[in-house]
């Protein structure tokens, strides 16, 4: 079966730049990679075809030979040069596949924030801090205890027994990665012997057993600013896990979680609460005290107030942590129906009900609803 033109395989023009070639190849590699298409022979063949095309066209000398003589110019069996599999001037597939694998798995190779071998940054930590509403609104100082990894003191974080030191890994030569040949291309992976550090411990420290770090719990003081809310994060720089091989320490992120309040519900900078009132206060009007985070305030209830009526107390909400004026407190009225009535109270209510008969002006919503019901059944 005749081979397809390499430019056609990659879907580019003959005069395409190196960047365009790389972009086209990366797109095809992502699409047809075996990890994305398990047990798909067609995709596997397309992947190999794209790999072969890119290895030729990304090498200046091979590309020149191909442009002049076609496949014969690069096929060793026909006297062409090079072949495939990575001579010194071959394509740098490790860079491309590093990008491809990053897209597959959501991160770079080697993990942890370090480079190839050598020092690596310590991991960041997360601590969930529970606060009540008053603490979140006003701010507070809290001591927390966090389990973490710190540098081993006897070996000063090297992992090697005192008087000795780590040695260069003979498997990877101190790089921390090894190259694996897979068909037409080679990829790099973490060295299985040194686990990416580039060095090995021949005489490990007795305290940390060669790890260079030990577990320890630290007590830290956290200053919580006023106005924080659930999901807000406070970063404590350098309070995460210690790095390895002398790498920098990670950070600690304190994540705020505000517990539910018995009276108030919070929505951003505004607070909400339900205010129960008697039906007599609702009908006749009155004045009552309602709670706020700053103490009690008087709320005037106009006569004829209905359940669901909302009263706004301006500035009685929360001042946001990122600045701006305080929000409001929204008071939702809930009219209570009296229970456990005495005989005299029932008599008075009966008299009151009788006095309302045939006078719909006292209950405009109810009269309108009943009129709607009558029209509904009249239309059936």
Swiss-Prot record:
Binds 2 Zn(2+) ions per monomer. GO terms for cellular component: cytoplasm. Its cofactor is Zn(2+). Gene3D superfamilies: DnaJ domain (1.10.287.110), Heat shock protein DnaJ, cysteine-rich domain (2.10.230.10), Urease metallochaperone UreE, N-terminal domain (2.60.260.20). The keyword Metal-binding applies. A zinc finger (CR-type) spans 139-217. Keywords: Chaperone, Cytoplasm, DNA replication, Metal-binding, Repeat, Stress response, Zinc, Zinc-finger. Zn(2+) 1 binds at residues 152, 155, 205, 208. CDD domains: DnaJ, DnaJ_C, DnaJ_zf. Transmembrane segments: none annotated. CXXCXGXG motif repeats lie at residues 152-159, 169-176, 191-198, 205-212. Its main location: cytoplasm. Belongs to the DnaJ family. HAMAP family: DnaJ. The J domain is necessary and sufficient to stimulate DnaK ATPase activity. Zinc center 1 plays an important role in the autonomous, DnaK-independent chaperone activity of DnaJ. Zinc center 2 is essential for interaction with DnaK and for DnaJ activity. This is Chaperone protein DnaJ. It comes from Pseudomonas savastanoi pv. phaseolicola (strain 1448A / Race 6).
